[in-house]
Amino acid sequence: MPPILILLTLLLPLRAGAEEIIGGHVVKPHSRPYMAFVMSVDIKGNRIYCGGFLIQDDFVLTAAHCKNSSVQSSMTVTLGAHNITAKEETQQIIPVAKDIPHPDYNATIFYSDIMLLKLESKAKRTKAVRPLKLPRSNARVKPGDVCSVAGWGSRSINDTKASARLREVQLVIQEDEECKKRFRYYTETTEICAGDLKKIKTPFKGDSGGPLVCDNQAYGLFAYAKNGTISSGIFTKVVHFLPWISWNMKLL
């Protein structure tokens, strides 16, 4: 997709159902080289855009709800971006050859909200484009651990447009039992709860699929936050889906 089309979509309000960063700060340009800007467009021109992250030169992980429900839709991934509204020399725009939502994905409760994207061509590794490591199968995060999530989301609750520049916020891993009280369908087996109960800091609109980074590894990807309660968000637990990710990458 030509860069100008991406610029035009960012002039539009965020689509309901996407998620964005609330709070946080603008990161040093290209200091998060794994970040991907994911766009899904159907035949009528309806767009969904999300975050995602490069895990191999030709594979990106994002949220399953970032896929347009229309059968006739296309997806593109932009890598190496900092200011998504600018035509940066570092950017690599690559069409998606195949999207693979998890077969157990439930759009109502965001269960198994994870999707693997196979790119049409391999990304060229540069200082602005590099994969993010996945954790080992026995790796865990615990309550109190501090992680981060980045994206091009809004800077405030009332802002309906995406941020031009990549922003990041630090989040604290929360107790599972506390999150079960606030999120009816929260499942600790497949999800991680992170945020800050005392501050308004969380992903919320326009940044679904962005990685929860702990110790330079992707432990989660952003799935959803509770309307009216944005002190924390729910992330799909990457460790739980490692066998599924590995299997599909070998098949393609």
From Swiss-Prot:
<feature type="glycosylation site" description="N-linked (GlcNAc...) asparagine">
    <location>
        <position position="227"/>
    </location>
</feature>
<feature type="disulfide bond">
    <location>
        <begin position="147"/>
        <end position="214"/>
    </location>
</feature>
<keyword id="KW-0720">Serine protease</keyword>
<feature type="glycosylation site" description="N-linked (GlcNAc...) asparagine">
    <location>
        <position position="83"/>
    </location>
</feature>
<keyword id="KW-0204">Cytolysis</keyword>
<dbReference type="GO" id="GO:0006508">
    <property type="term" value="P:proteolysis"/>
</dbReference>
<feature type="glycosylation site" description="N-linked (GlcNAc...) asparagine">
    <location>
        <position position="158"/>
    </location>
</feature>
<feature type="disulfide bond">
    <location>
        <begin position="179"/>
        <end position="193"/>
    </location>
</feature>
<protein>
    <recommendedName>
        <fullName>Granzyme D</fullName>
        <ecNumber>3.4.21.-</ecNumber>
    </recommendedName>
</protein>
<comment type="function">
    <text>This enzyme is probably necessary for target cell lysis in cell-mediated immune responses.</text>
</comment>
<feature type="glycosylation site" description="N-linked (GlcNAc...) asparagine">
    <location>
        <position position="106"/>
    </location>
</feature>
<dbReference type="InterPro" id="IPR001254">
    <property type="entry name" value="Trypsin_dom"/>
</dbReference>
<keyword id="KW-0458">Lysosome</keyword>
<feature type="signal peptide">
    <location>
        <begin position="1"/>
        <end position="18"/>
    </location>
</feature>
<comment type="similarity">
    <text>Belongs to the peptidase S1 family. Granzyme subfamily.</text>
</comment>
<dbReference type="GO" id="GO:0031640">
    <property type="term" value="P:killing of cells of another organism"/>
</dbReference>
<dbReference type="InterPro" id="IPR043504">
    <property type="entry name" value="Peptidase_S1_PA_chymotrypsin"/>
</dbReference>
<dbReference type="GO" id="GO:0044194">
    <property type="term" value="C:cytolytic granule"/>
</dbReference>
<keyword id="KW-0732">Signal</keyword>
<feature type="domain" description="Peptidase S1">
    <location>
        <begin position="21"/>
        <end position="250"/>
    </location>
</feature>
<dbReference type="GO" id="GO:0004252">
    <property type="term" value="F:serine-type endopeptidase activity"/>
</dbReference>
<feature type="glycosylation site" description="N-linked (GlcNAc...) asparagine">
    <location>
        <position position="68"/>
    </location>
</feature>
<dbReference type="InterPro" id="IPR018114">
    <property type="entry name" value="TRYPSIN_HIS"/>
</dbReference>
<dbReference type="Pfam" id="PF00089">
    <property type="entry name" value="Trypsin"/>
</dbReference>
<keyword id="KW-0645">Protease</keyword>
<feature type="active site" description="Charge relay system">
    <location>
        <position position="113"/>
    </location>
</feature>
<feature type="propeptide">
    <location>
        <begin position="19"/>
        <end position="20"/>
    </location>
</feature>
<keyword id="KW-0378">Hydrolase</keyword>
<keyword id="KW-1015">Disulfide bond</keyword>
<feature type="active site" description="Charge relay system">
    <location>
        <position position="208"/>
    </location>
</feature>
<feature type="active site" description="Charge relay system">
    <location>
        <position position="65"/>
    </location>
</feature>
<dbReference type="InterPro" id="IPR033116">
    <property type="entry name" value="TRYPSIN_SER"/>
</dbReference>
<feature type="disulfide bond">
    <location>
        <begin position="50"/>
        <end position="66"/>
    </location>
</feature>
<dbReference type="InterPro" id="IPR001314">
    <property type="entry name" value="Peptidase_S1A"/>
</dbReference>
<keyword id="KW-0865">Zymogen</keyword>
<dbReference type="InterPro" id="IPR009003">
    <property type="entry name" value="Peptidase_S1_PA"/>
</dbReference>
<keyword id="KW-0325">Glycoprotein</keyword>
